[in-house]
């Protein structure tokens, strides 16, 4: 059986252009992810929203 995980880009909402890549299983989590993560450009924890990897 093939893997169903997809790569997603988590982009900072602080407007710095900083992003991280991660994977998710769309069968378990079909909605877009939103996580609080550290943005080193602003030196704070900010909200990261899921974007599509190109």
Swiss-Prot record:
GO molecular function ontology, one term from the record: structural constituent of ribosome
One GO biological process term: translation
InterPro entries tied to this protein: Ribosomal_bL33, Ribosomal_bL33_sf, Ribosomal_zn-bd
Keywords: Ribonucleoprotein, Ribosomal protein
Gene from which this protein is expressed: rpmG
Name of this chain's protein: Large ribosomal subunit protein bL33
Matches recorded under Pfam families: Ribosomal_L33 (PF00471)
GO cellular component: cytoplasm; large ribosomal subunit
Family: Belongs to the bacterial ribosomal protein bL33 family.
SUPFAM superfamilies in the cross-refs: Zn-binding ribosomal proteins
């Amino acid at each position: 059986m093939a893997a169903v995980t997809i790569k997603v880009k988590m982009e900072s909402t602080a407007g710095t252009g900083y992003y991280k890549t991660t994977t998710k299983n769309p069968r378990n989590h079909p909605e877009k992810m939103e996580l609080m993560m550290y943005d080193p450009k602003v030196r704070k924890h900010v909200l990261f929203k899921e974007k599509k990897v190109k």
